[in-house]
Amino acid sequence: MARRTDRAPLLDWAEGPGVSPAPETEQGERWAQGYGAAWERRPAGELTPLPQLEDDHIAAVFVVTFDPRSGNIVEWCRPHDIDLEGVEFKSMASGSHRVQSDFIYFRKGGFFGLACFANMPVESELERGARMKSVGVLSPSYTLLYRYMHFLENQVRHQLEIPGHYTPLEAFYEDKKGVLPVGPQTCQPALHWLPPVHKHLYPEMKITHPAGCMSQFIKFFGEQIFVLWKFALLRKRILIFSPPPVGVVCYRVYCCCCLANVTLPGIGATAPESKPFFYVNVADIQTLDGEGSYVACTTEKIFEQKQDLYDVYVDNQNVKTHREHLQPLLRVNSADKEKYQRLNDQRQLLMYSQEVDGDCGSCEEDLFILFFMEQNNRIFQTLLEVASSQDKTLTAEHARSMGLDPHGDRTFLMDLLEVYGFDLMLVIDNPCCP
């Protein structure tokens, strides 16, 4: 069994823009080690620790407040000269005034952000009876943002109770900051890191990551997971709508991205890159309009009317598409039901193993990611084998061997061949024809 790490499952399989390696200390050791190593499983079953990536750093820290006169504003940030335009709306989702607290993942150019929001009743008439703030960070990579969750939750409460006291945030930034290269920022900034200082000035951070988010995702969508799986694998533009709180919906974005994991080399070279955008608002319309593939969530209902921005719209548990040729993919077929049953069987077996054997070395997140990764690899391995054969013909038997319904998944298979550039002939009898 692979050793568990404290790395978050939150999109741990993908990195954001590249990060420069950490400089070595005088003792020749990497600083900020001790977060636990990731592990790689070799074909023979041997576990080998992966190189420790030094990406536990930030590009900015900020405080956003709601001003009754001016609306959302950035009241404080470090560094002073970083472009935070739009962050005041990304870190305080539309409709947040209806909830007491929330957290939000988002993208800002080539950076990823995490912000914690809180809403506190006050007696001040100037503040109209409520004080609302968000405290957040930007990073070139989203894989370790979860580490800051507990700290940001504490700091937003601190800012509500003692506005204007930024000393812990100053110390946090000095410890975690990266230095942007001189010159115009590109969409993929490379950061160069400074050694940490002032660790004693801010509270120790608890490891907080979305444990259980996969289980909630499965329970929420049920068999429709396999509808989302097909759309994710086809690199469609998926937009998830939900009223606040939006944090749990950001995790649904993550789960959707995990559905499309493929580890076979050479797969996906012709397919558009699938990008997690997490929370988006109307200010992101122009950006989304230029994207060929993404998964995002929003609290703004107006997006539903802008059908040119998305292929798939998810409202609560209602998955729908206005694209006529994608309509057949909305139906859950017999093969989907079988896969869903197999997934649940594996979950039950895992829970039994944890209860009886005390197996704490595996978790449901690992099982979920591995289940879909193996399913996807199974499909593409079959397609690669057929592509290397002489007749290059994909039959109903091939479809069954891939865990697909030859007739119910015909449209899905045809689209899959086109998206991933497989020049194969699909020979599956149409059940509607004699």
Curated annotation (Swiss-Prot):
Zinc-finger: is it a keyword of this entry?
no
Q: What is this protein called?
A: DENN domain-containing protein 11
Task: Mention any Pfam family matching this sequence.
Answer: DENND11
List, alphabetically, the InterPro entries matched. DENND11/AVL9_GEFs, LCHN/Anr2, Tripartite_DENN
UniProt function note: Probable guanine nucleotide exchange factor (GEF). May promote the exchange of GDP to GTP, converting inactive GDP-bound small GTPases into their active GTP-bound form.
Q: Which keywords describe this protein according to UniProt?
A: Guanine-nucleotide releasing factor
Look up keyword Ion transport and say if it applies.
no
- Tell me the ranges covered by the cDENN domain, including all copies: 194-341
Region (Disordered): which ranges?
Answer: 1-29
Q: Which PROSITE patterns match?
A: DENN
Q: Which residues form the dDENN domain?
A: 343-434
List GO molecular-function terms, semicolon-separated: guanyl-nucleotide exchange factor activity
Q: Which family does it belong to?
A: Belongs to the DENND11 family.
Query: Which residue range or ranges hold the uDENN domain?
Result: 1-168
Organism domain of life: Eukaryota
**GO CC entries:** cytoplasm
